[in-house]
Amino acid sequence: LTGANTYTGGTTISGGGTLALGAGGSLASTGAVTLAGTGATLDLSGATGAQTIGTLAGAGGTSVNLGANALTLNATTNGTFGGAIGGTGGVTVAGTGTQTLTGAN
């Protein structure tokens, strides 16, 4: 995705799929992102700056590639992410929900 999106719902990335945010790309700042199945990847490495989403969910075998970008989890509900988070960027948890990270990062 290379454009700013205006939908406010959640985003699901199916197993084996990759959603890559490019220059100027964005997702809803409160929409949940679910990595649903082995090999599902959220790739922020090509984005031009920090990204904010809602809750992050996914099991082992899924991944988030930050590159050098920061990811803010602005959750209003509780979520669990069991996949791997890689890259040199950072992760910030904001909002009123609890985000649990159970994978090796």
Protein language model annotation of sequence segments:
Residues 66-80, 86-87:
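Extracellular/surface-exposed low-complexity segments
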Residues 91-97:
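Primary detection of the long, small/polar-rich alpha-helical "axial" segments characteristic
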Residues 1-61, 79-88, 99-105:
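Surface-exposed loop/turn positions within long extracellular repeat scaffolds
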